[in-house]
Amino acid sequence: MLSDLRYALRMLVKSPAFTAVAVITLALGIGANTAIFSVVEGTLLRPLPFPHAERLVVIYETLVENDARAAANALSDRTLTRFREFGRDIFEDVAGATYRIVAVGLNDGSPLQAARATGVTSNFFDVVGLPPAKGRNFSSEEARAGASAVVIVSDDFWRNTLNRRDDVLGRTLVVDGTPRTIIGVMPKAFRYPIRAQMWLPLVLEPNNPTTRNNHYLYGVARLRPGVTAAKAEGAVKRMCAASNRDDPDPANARAAYMLPLRESFVMDLRPKLLVIVAAAVCALLIAATNFAGLLLARVVEREGELALRAALGASRRRLVRQQLVQALLLAVIGTAFGLLIASWITPMLFALSPEASDFGGGVMREFDSAPRLDLPVFAFAAGVMALVGLGFGLLPAMRASRTDLRAAISATARGATLDRGARRLLASFVVIELAIAAALLTASVTATQYFRKLIEEPWGFETKDRLGFNVAVPDGFFPTAMAKQAALENSLAQLRTVPGVESATVVSPSPMGASWSLMEFNAEGAPAPEPSGVYTAYARVPVPGYFAAMGQPLLQGRDFRESDTADAPLVCIVSQSIAKRFWPNESPIGKRIKWGRLDAERPWSTVVGVVGDSKAIGDPGDGEVPGMIARPLSQMLAQATAPLFNITFVLHTNGRAITEATIRSALARANPNLAARNFWSMDDAAAQSHATERFIFVLVSAFAFLGLVLAAIGLYGLLALQVARRQREFGIRSALGATARQIIELVAWQCAALLSLGFTAGALATYGMVRLVRNQWAEMPAPNFIAWICAAIVLGVAMMIASWLPARRAARVDPVVALRAE
C-alpha cells in the first residue's frame, strides 16, 4: 500500500494541471457542503444543552385540535396547574414562563436600561434540567406572593452589563422599581426561553377569577421515561376534556397541542434548510461527477501504459488499487483545501443567516447554534471524502484494469478516436452534470423571483425615515392605567420636540414584528366558525394619530380620538380585509366586534374606522392577509388583565440622523423611569425581515453558479479530449473541402446534443424535487416558464463558451500534420 501511495504521488506531481483541476473541483464541492453542514448541525442536529432533551415537550392551548398553526395560544395558570396535578403519570413535571421587558437599575447612578426578562415557575430549571452555572435555582417559597425578591441573570448580562464581577451573587438589581438579589448566573449561551437576559420567579394564580383564562404562559414539560409522544397526546386530550367538563363556560373550552422542544423551534425552518441542503448536495454531485470524468479521461489517456503494465505481470487487483489510492489521495487533498474554504465561508454563512438578524426569524438564538468546524463537521467531511474518493473513483479504476493490450495500444495510437464505451461513459458524466446544473439554475431563477416578490410586496405603511424602539413601562413605577398612559403621552410630547422629528407615535406590539400577536374575535352578524368558535386577526393597540404617522391610509370612518377614553364606549378600527370578509356589501362603520366566542360574557366594540391592510414579519408567503383589529391604548390599558407586550415608539424623521443618546435624553426628561431598548430603522428591519428567504436565495444562486462552472469545466474537458482524439478525422474533412465554420458547427452540434439531453433530464428532476419540497414547504413556488427559459439561456451561453476553445482547435487542425501518421 505504501508503494501505491508513492506511485500515486509521483503521478500527481507529473501531471500538475490534472491535479490542480481535480483538487480545485473537490475543494469547492466538499468545502461548500461542509460549510452548509455546519449550519445544519448547529440548527437541527446539535444536542440541546439539557439532559435527555428528547423528553422535553412544549405544550400549547388551541381552539382547533391537532392544528399546529392554530396553536398560537399560550397556557393559562389554570391549565398549567391542572396538567401538573392530573398528568403525573405522563409528566415528571410541567413548568411555565412568560416574557416582558423590564427596566433595570444597577445601583451605580447610571440610567435605567431595558432588558428581556422571563418570569418562570420555580421548577422551570429543574424541568429543563439545567441548573445555574453560579449560585442556585429558585426555591418554591420564592414563587409565592410576598416572598423575598430574587433574580437569576444570563451569562451575557453578567459579562456585558455587570462586568464579570466575581461578587455578583448577593448583589442587588432594581428591576421595575423592586430591589432584587442576584442568586444565580446561567451557563454561557443559554437564553431560553425568548432570548432572556434574566429570570424572575413567577407567581401563578389559578383560582383568580379575573385572570384564570388569561393565556400568557409558555409551557414546557418533561415526559416520564418510556412515555411515547402518542401516549402523552392522548393523556393531554383527556385532561383537556375533563377540564372543559368542569368549566361550563364554552368560551374557556380548549384543546392542547404538544411538540418536542427542538421541533417547536425548527418546524418552520427545516424545509427551508432542506432546500439549501439539496442545492449543496447537487453541487457536490456535479463536483464528484466531474472528478470521476477527470479520472476517466486520465485513464483513457494512459490506456496503453496500463495495458502494457498488465501484460508485464501487474494484476488487475493491483491496477484497480493504484487508481483508487490515487483517487483517494486527490480526495484527501481536496478535502483539506475544502476545510480551509469552509472555515472561510462559515462565518459569512452565519452573518447571512436568520440567526444573525433581529428581524429575520432566527429560531435558535436561545442556545449556542452558531456554525463551527467541530468534530461532527470533520466527521462529515471525512465521510464525503471517502464517498467521493472511493465511490466515484471506482468506475475509472475498473476501466484502468482492462487488460487487452492490442485494443489499448490501438486506442492510444496517433489518430485513433475514443472507443464507443469511453465516449458514452464520458458523455454520460457530462449529461449528468448538465442535468444537475439545469436543475440548480432553474431553482435559482425561481428563488430570485420569489425573493423579489417578497421584497416588492408593500408593507401597507411607510418605513422610510421611521425609527422604532421598545420601552418598558414597569408596574413598580406605573401601577395604574392612568400612570402608564400619562408616562407614554409625556414621552411622546418630549420626543416630538427633538430636532428632526416630524411626528411620534406609540403602538403595541411592534408594527412589523407582530405576526405572533393573534387575537380571537367574532363579528356581529357572522356565524361562528366550527369547531373553534372564533376567528383570528392581528392585534394592534395604538394611540390616536398612529395610522397617520405610519402612513397607513384611513379608508372609511375616523381615527381614534383623545375622547376614546376608558369611560367612553368601546371602539375599534379594522383593516380592509376584515371589512371585506364580514361586511362585503355594506359599510362596516357601526358594526360590532366581540373578543373571544359569541357566547362569552364580554363587551362589544363598535367599528369606527377602516384602514388599509398591512403585513408583519413572519406572515405566510402565500399572500393571504390575516387582517388586523386595533383598539385604542387608553381603553386597553384600563381593561387589560395582562400587560401589553412590545410597547413600541415610532419616530417619523425628516431624514436627519437622530442618535440613540438623543432619544434616551428626551425620554429621561419626560420620565426617568422609562427604559428604552432595541433601537432600529424600519427600513433596515424591512430589509432584514426576509433574512431566511434571502439566505436561501443567495445560497441556491451560489450553488447554481458553482454547478454551472463545474459543468462547463466537464464539458470543456470532454470536448477537448474528443478533439484531440479526432484530429485525423478533422484533417481528412479539411482535406476534402470542409471549412473551419463547418468543423466548428460539428463540435457545436455535439455540444448541443449533450446540452439538450442534460436540460431535459434536469427539467424532469426539477419537477420531481419541487413536488417533494412543496409537501414540506407549501409557500415554495413552482418554476414558471420564465424560470425555465432563463435557466436554458444561461446554461446554453455557458456551454457555448466552454465549447468554443475545443471547436476553434478542431477548426485549426492542419490536414498535413493530421495525416502525417498515415
Segments (PLM) and residue ranges:
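Alpha-helical transmembrane segments of integral membrane proteins
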Residues: M1-T19, L261-V266, L295-R321, V325, ...
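Membrane-helix entry/capping segments
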Residues: M1-V21, F50, A72, P111, ...
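Short, strongly hydrophobic transmembrane alpha-helices
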Residues: S15-T43, I286-T289, A331-A336, L426-Y450, ...
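Alpha-helical transmembrane segments
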Residues: L28-T62, L296, T346-A356, I436-D465, ...
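Small-residue-rich transmembrane alpha-helices
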Residues: I36, A292, L328-L405, Q449, ...
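Membrane-proximal extracellular/periplasmic loop immediately following the first transmembrane helix
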Residues: E41, L48-I101, N214-V220, L259, ...
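Mid-to-C-terminal secondary-structure elements
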Residues: V102, R116-S140, S148-L274, P347-S353, ...
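Interfacial "coupling" helices/loops that link adjacent transmembrane helices in transporter permeases
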Residues: T289-A331, A416, I713-A752, R809, ...
